[in-house]
Regions:
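Flexible, glycine-rich surface segments
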Residues: 1-82
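C-terminal soluble interaction/assembly domains
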Residues: 57-132
Length: 132
């Protein structure tokens, strides 16, 4: 599913959080500072898009291309596409894994990485950050 891929890549990025804590989030995901700012500012709208279009549990391979794979931008099929950074599915997956880990500080890195996607998603109670 799209969600499984999001959390898979979210785990990789969370691992980077622990492995290279001195690096910025933008460096970890490969974004420019502007792309990182765009992702943070629009996190709530990105999440709303996934929910409203009911694509989290979809297995359509095209969703991987649109939201996970490297491309010049993420393909929402909206006017804002060309402004968006690539791989926003990975970015949202990262935020889900981070919220899960924050809610379970007793778990080791290995335990977090070994949790299945469904557990991480449900127990994260993911809520996108509000734009500042």
């Amino acid at each position: 599913t799209l969600l499984a891929s999001m959390i898979y890549y979210g785990k990789i990025l969370y691992f980077k959080d622990k492995l290279i804590p001195g690096y910025s989030d933008a460096e970890k995901i490969g974004y420019t500072a502007d792309e990182m700012e765009w992702a943070r500012t629009n996190e709530e709208q990105i999440w709303r898009y996934f929910i409203e279009h009911e694509i989290l549990f979809d297995t359509d391979a095209n969703l991987q291309k649109r939201f996970i794979n490297l491309a010049p931008f993420t393909k929402f099929r909206l006017q804002l596409d060309s402004e968006s950074p690539p791989q926003l599915g990975q970015y949202i997956g990262w935020q889900i894994v981070r919220q899960f880990a924050d809610k379970h500080p007793d778990l080791s890195l290995q335990e977090v990485l070994q949790k299945d996607d469904e557990q991480i998603f449900k127990q994260s109670n993911y809520k996108p950050r509000k734009p500042e």
